[in-house]
Amino acid sequence: MYYNLANECDIKLAHLRGRIGTEQNTLRPGGHSKGENDMKRTKKVIALALVLVMAAALLSGCGETGSAGTAASGKTYNLVYQCAWGSGGGPYQYASDLSKAIVEASGGRVTMECLATNSIVPTTDMLQAVSNGTLDCAQTAATNLSDDSLGILSTLPVGMTFDEYMGWYVAGEGQQILDEVMAEIDSNVVAFPCGVVDSEILYHSTTPITCLDDIKGLKIRGVSDWANIETRLGASVVTMDGGDCYEALSRGTIDAAEYSSPSANWAAGFQEVAPYLTVPGVHQSCAVYLFLINRGVWESMDEQTQNIIKLACTAMMAQNWAEDRVANGQAWEQFKELEAQGKLTIYRMPDEDIAKIQQVADEYYAEKCQSNPLFAKIYESQQAYIQSVGNWSEAASY
């Protein structure tokens, strides 16, 4: 059995290396790169794909004979895949990287191309579109889903950090909770955490926001739990798709917006229409993205293909965060340069106001747990995980 496993995996790797050579020649005609960043990213995706195909082969018993539905069946899957992000920014690139890794690792059994937000359906309709088969799969944040209980699956204001979300999903009961939640809200969709971005900027605004008193009465774009907390803090919250924020700020439809991390916000151009910026992003210390796939499509896949997709999703969480942290450092320097030129003013929310936000948030969560059993189920699981690792985290910090 060991010989068969090694032999079949060698064949798959040889096939992948052939594809890699072809792609490298395409990307670098005449020895010249079309862009150093594109090349580096392509190499990372290919390297990840090689790891995934080996891991998936091992997990699914690659090489065992007579195991129906385990080794690759030879069936191909052409997936219609849309993400919740506009093309050009980091989140879209990460969603695209996921599809490329799956395609490469599958050896061509899976074909999929990342479509930008609203290409086929609006972002808020993506869950339903995956359920009814309009989309085969999608990447989004739980804050974009229609059920108010679900935002916590991706982020929670003054809640878990990236490493805590990663631990909860990978080593805690996060995936189990996600499975149970999806079965309850839409049994025709399977979901996995598949990416994560760094802490966000709190506000881009057309009027200075230096403290909590300044948000009172302002029209501010907000989503999910943060929108409800902002309302309690005195803001006039406006719900809109993230892709509409630039135009809304430009036209004065809103006074301020939270959108994403520095690299994504810079790419979106908010510095062009909003001369004020406020940190820290207490509303979102990170954002975990979810890969949604139609259950019928998922169950039609052989086990090896399923394992490739699951492994790609997990691997992309770490890769996205690492890349986003670097990109955000670079983007933040660009924001600081604008400030030095007198074109932007950056404010930091006072510590006492951050403590106030925490207090209001805790009160809101306690009330929501009483009225929303689904939210309570997720919240209590996350709090139990934080407590289980908290003592050591505190002891190890310096």
Where are the regions that the model predicts?
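Short, low-complexity disordered leader/linker segments with a strong preference
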Residues: 1-78, 393-398
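N-terminal secretory/targeting leader peptides
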Residues: 35, 63-165, 184, 189-398
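Hydrophobic transmembrane signal anchors and adjacent membrane-proximal interface regions, especially
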Residues: 45-50, 100, 171, 258
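A gly/proline- and charged-residue-enriched helix-loop-helix capping module
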Residues: 163-181
